[in-house]
Amino acid sequence: MSDLHNESIFITGGGSGLGLALVERFIEEGAQVATLELSAAKVASLRQRFGEHILAVEGNVTCYADYQRAVDQILTRSGKLDCFIGNAGIWDHNASLVNTPAETLETGFHELFNVNVLGYLLGAKACAPALIASEGSMIFTLSNAARYPGGGGPLYTASKHAATGLIRQLAYELAPKVRVNGVGPCGMASDLRGPQALGQSETSIMQSLTPEKIAAILPLQFFPQPADFTGPYVMLASRRNNRALSGVMINADAGLAIRGIRHVAAGLDL
């Protein structure tokens, strides 16, 4: 029997990409899975596909009331919450400082940080009482952009660095009751979109980066699928396999940390 059998897991952005892969993996592990998903169509698809194995709640990660509504439903269903996985996010499609108009930069910043940073903070706030009671864990999705420049533009990179700081602070504040960690994947096949303020809400990451381009920069030389990244989340959520890790960021980046993103300078053509 899996360590996660009957554990109550709450994942944001479970309708596609990495979030969907996490939903699938934790259900396979025997967990009671819930997700907060913005898209009504994706919520309907999750319910149709997984039936009683999923509690899919339509809501926005930038709204605390939506989080609280989801947590209330989780506690009614499962009687507890063991792990919160903050995963929903948006990317900036490498929008650069020089080429982004000032007014767009400002509105794009607020939209992206609201999702990528405030969304994590609000989720942590809503889940903290239940996780303190269960002595559970929080896991947040980061990125190679949480460590290196070049994994996005300044908006995205700054948001992931901010999320790293949030993980460390929450790990400090919530110890010894709650373990708080992060997983930093590299690029993968997903439907990751950008901010509406930058005109990117209908543009997925795969329209900006080809599989060949992603594979070429990775030392392991393959194009990752979302399921390739679920293992670290399972390990971090497991009480038996993770008794000692908190405030840790796992780089699940196909070896990118060996050398980083090697461009001498991005502004050579300025």
UniProtKB/Swiss-Prot annotation:
Pathway(s): Aromatic compound metabolism; 3-phenylpropanoate degradation
Organism: Shigella sonnei (strain Ss046)
Residues binding substrate, per UniProt: S143
Active site: Y156
Underlying gene: hcaB
GO molecular function: 2,3-dihydroxy-2,3-dihydro-phenylpropionate dehydrogenase activity
Protein name: 3-phenylpropionate-dihydrodiol/cinnamic acid-dihydrodiol dehydrogenase
Binding locations of NAD(+): 10-34
Key word Nuclease present: no
Functional summary from the UniProt entry: Converts 3-phenylpropionate-dihydrodiol (PP-dihydrodiol) and cinnamic acid-dihydrodiol (CI-dihydrodiol) into 3-(2,3-dihydroxylphenyl)propanoic acid (DHPP) and 2,3-dihydroxicinnamic acid (DHCI), respectively.
Catalyses which reaction(s): 3-(cis-5,6-dihydroxycyclohexa-1,3-dien-1-yl)propanoate + NAD(+) = 3-(2,3-dihydroxyphenyl)propanoate + NADH + H(+); (2E)-3-(cis-5,6-dihydroxycyclohexa-1,3-dien-1-yl)prop-2-enoate + NAD(+) = (2E)-3-(2,3-dihydroxyphenyl)prop-2-enoate + NADH + H(+)
GO biological process: 3-phenylpropionate catabolic process
Keywords for this protein: Aromatic hydrocarbons catabolism, NAD, Oxidoreductase
Family membership noted in the UniProt record: Belongs to the short-chain dehydrogenases/reductases (SDR) family.
